[in-house]
Each structure stands twice: as structure tokens, then as C-alpha cells.
Regions:
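Formylglycine-dependent sulfatase
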Residues: 1-349
């Protein structure tokens, strides 16, 4: 199982020295496995880093390996080997749940039909993913080759060029927002939050930000349950603490850091639930668990969540310089730990 956080900094994990944020479940992986002090992502931004992880190639070798728009085509060459295809060839059932942001389909894809190529074309047997990112449209989940829960009588339309007639935007209709943008993020409104890009229709399929952690945990546990009697590979791709940071109500106020801290607490809870489920199924000693982050931390990444104002004495990058988007160390120097209970001796490297 690879658990991949989104914009989590080296100093955001208590196993790496955070005293303000407590992450007991992520810490369990570090304490019961090997905690690496020099773990690096391949890029200080999302899509290139994730491309590198799954393809085994440095992103600078791929011309379009950049932060992708929400309707970008699939970034992978489907005839090339990937991490999931290699494991599938070795007899593993492979699945991805959570954030994707690696493109889907081609330039002229109809979101109301089959969405391909995608994860299933690069080696995953099963997929339940966010179509792009939680701040980009379309705000839907894609299960296999289709949008989950889409009503054919209410088709979805997506554009990154212009708005659809009559549709409100964060720029023109700020009175409709419960979370306001600090820069960009002022286009189509969904769930009281304006996003990047324009979208219309598909109401029955739109996700609820507050439920996202539960949705992805449910699907991850279901994948494990379906495949517990045979070898499996799960890419559990967390969406936290990427913006917009909208925790479930039960996590609101769990930290002193506002929404950014609260969604990290939510992510830590999800990791704990997954670890507990492996314990329950007696799979822990037969499962390698890898935890890391796609890039370093950022406080204000487009929404007014008081991340800067409430940060206090917390140091998301630890003692490192820089963060997300930066070529300084904290852009790519991330938490990285590997646990294989009974086979890997706990320690620090």
C-alpha cells in the first residue's frame, strides 16, 4: 500500500518533529518501520511528482509533466510500463483510490461517456478517483471509466475557456460563497466554494468536500476486502492538506491551526482507520506500507482559510527552506517511511 499525502510538509508530522500538530497514526508507520530523513519527491508540484512515482521516470523527461488543468488528457503513454502494470504482471490486483490529477481521456473527451484512457489503461485493475483535484472542475468521482452517480438526464459540461451562460462564479457572485478565494479559484461554484474552471450540470454526481475523506476511506477498505485473499497493490492517494481545506464537521477545531491543521488531523485519522482495518483482517504482517507526500507544504494556496494567520509557532517545513513550488529543499524533501511489521526492523535512516 502506498499512502500519498498532498502538500504535506516535512514538519507537519509529529514523527518528524512537529510539536503543534500531532499525527499519531502516521507516526505509527514511522515508529514501527523505517523513518527516512532524506526522502525526496521528484518534483515540488503535484502532477509531475505523481507521474514520476507511477511511471518510474523523472518528470523533466516528459514534456507535459506540469500542473495539469482539470480537463487535461492522460499524461502517461499507455504502451509504457508503470508501477501498477509491473505489479499486475507479477500477479497483484491493483487499485487506486483518491486524488488523481494525471489527466484523463483525450483532448475531446465527453465526460458523460466512457472516460478513457485513464488508470485502467496504465495498469490499475480498479479505480475510484477524483477527476482532477478538489479545487478544479469537474467536481466528481470517476469509478472505472465513468463518472460515479451521473444522471444521463442531467449531463455535465466542462470548460477551461469560458463560463456557461447563467452559471454563477466566485468572481461575479461572492455572496454565494462559504469559502472565499485569496487568489484565482474564482470560477464555477460548487458546495459554496469557487473552483478553477467552469462546469454545468451533473448535479447528482458532484462530490461533497466534507465527505471526501470518508468516501476515499470507504472505497479503499472495500478494495482491500475484495482482494484480501490474494496479492494486492493499493495506491491510497489522499487529498489533504491540498486546498480547499474543508474537513468533515467532526474534525473542525481539532487543531489550533484552522482548516489546514484540521484536515491534516482528518488525514491522520484516515491512515489510522486503514491500519486498524489491516490489523482486523490480520494482513499487517503481510503488507508493506509506504507513506510519503507528493511535495512540500504551502499555507495560502488560493483560499482564505487563515492558514498564515493561525500558523503560530508551527513550522510545516521543519527547519528546511522553501515549500511547494520551490526548488529549495522543502519543495521536495518530504516525509517518507516504510513499514513491514515483522520483516523490517524499526529504525531511522
Amino acid at each position: 500500500i502506498v499512502i500519498y499525502a498532498d502538500d504535506l510538509g516535512f514538519g507537519d508530522v509529529s514523527a518528524y518533529g512537529s510539536t503543534v500538530l500531532k499525527t499519531p497514526n502516521i507516526d505509527r508507520i514511522a515508529n514501527e518501520g523505517i523513518k527516512f530523513m532524506n526522502g525526496y519527491a521528484a518534483s515540488p508540484t503535484c502532477s509531475p511528482s505523481r507521474y514520476a512515482l507511477l511511471s518510474g521516470n523523472y518528470p523533466f523527461k516528459k514534456a507535459n509533466a506540469r500542473v495539469l488543468r482539470g480537463n487535461a488528457p492522460l499524461i502517461f503513454d499507455t504502451d509504457k510500463q508503470t508501477l501498477p502494470s509491473m505489479l499486475r504482471d507479477a500477479g497483484y490486483t491493483t487499485g487506486v483510490v483518491g486524488k488523481w490529477h494525471l489527466g484523463l481521456g483525450d483532448e475531446n473527451m465527453d465526460w458523460n461517456g466512457e472516460i478513457k484512457p485513464g488508470p485502467l489503461e496504465i495498469g490499475f485493475d480498479e479505480s475510484y478517483i477524483m477527476a482532477s483535484t478538489n479545487d478544479r472542475v469537474p467536481s466528481v468521482y470517476v469509478k472505472g471509466h465513468r463518472i460515479d452517480g451521473l444522471d444521463s438526464n442531467d449531463p455535465i459540461e466542462v470548460s477551461y475557456k469560458e463560463n456557461f451562460e447563467g452559471e454563477p462564479t466566485g468572481k461575479e457572485n461572492p455572496e454565494l460563497l462559504k469559502l472565499h478565494p485569496s487568489h484565482g479559484h474564482n470560477m464555477s461554484i460548487h458546495n459554496g466554494i469557487s473552483r478553477i474552471g467552469f462546469m454545468r450540470g451533473g448535479k447528482s454526481a458532484l462530490f461533497t468536500d466534507e465527505d471526501m475523506a470518508d468516501d476515499f476511506l470507504r472505497e479503499s477498505k472495500a478494495f482491500i476486502d475484495r482482494n484480501k485473499e490474494k496479492p494486492f497493490f493499493l495506491f491510497y492517494s489522499l487529498h489533504q492538506p491540498h486546498v480547499p481545506r474543508v474537513p468533515h464537521p467532526r474534525f473542525v477545531g481539532k487543531t489550533s491551526l484552522g482548516p489546514r491543521g484540521d484536515v491534516i488531523a482528518e488525514a491522520d485519522w484516515g491512515v489510522g482507520q486503514l491500519l486498524d482495518y489491516l490489523d482486523e483482517l490480520k494482513l499487517t504482517e503481510n503488507t508493506i506500507i509506504i507513506f510519503s507526500s507528493d511535495n512540500g507544504p504551502v499555507l495560502d494556496d488560493g483560499y482564505k482559510t487563515d492558514a498564515v494567520e493561525k500558523n503560530g509557532n508551527h513550522t510545516p517545513a521543519g527547519k528546511l527552506r522553501g515549500g511547494k513550488y520551490s526548488l529549495f529543499d522543502a519543495g521536495t524533501h518530504v516525509p517518507f517511511m516504510v513499514m513491514w511489521k515483522g520483516s523490517i526492523e524499526p529504525g531511522t535512516s
